[in-house]
Each structure stands twice: as structure tokens, then as C-alpha cells.
Amino acid sequence: MAILRSKEIWDMEVDEIQDKLVELRAELSKNVSKSAAAGVIENPGKIRELKRTIARVLTILNEKQKEN
């Protein structure tokens, strides 16, 4: 999954953002468990980027909900 930029998230509806958040959390969980089981994953920076993207999504989601 591609990393989402702020502009892309702002252009989404709240329902879309929540769906994307579920997908990102599932992907993070999969990567963390793969890292714990195998010890080595293909792209170790992916976990960090997923965490940052989740934080970005949550921040924008909270701002959008405060606007309404």
C-alpha cells in the first residue's frame, strides 16, 4: 500500500478515512507480527512509515470531526 499524503487524506470523506485507517492498522499488525516471527523483514522502514501514516490519518480525522 502506498503511503498517503496529507492532501490525499483531506480530499477523502470521513467514512473513507475510517476505512483506510482499518486497512493501515491491519497492514501494520501484519508487518509487526512478521518481524517478530522471522526477525528480518524485507523493508524495515515500512513499519515506521505505517505508524506515521496512521498518526497523520488520525490527526486529520480528528480535525475533520471538529469542523462538523
From Swiss-Prot:
Keywords from the named record: Ribonucleoprotein, Ribosomal protein
Disulfide links within the chain: none
Pfam family for this entry, one: Ribosomal_L29
GO biological process, one term: translation
Spans through the membrane: none
InterPro entries: Ribosomal_uL29, Ribosomal_uL29_CS, Ribosomal_uL29_sf
Matching Gene3D superfamilies: 1.10.287.310
NCBIfam families listed in its UniProt record: L29 (TIGR00012)
Family, per entry: Belongs to the universal ribosomal protein uL29 family.
Record protein name field: Large ribosomal subunit protein uL29
Organism: Methanobrevibacter smithii (strain ATCC 35061 / DSM 861 / OCM 144 / PS)
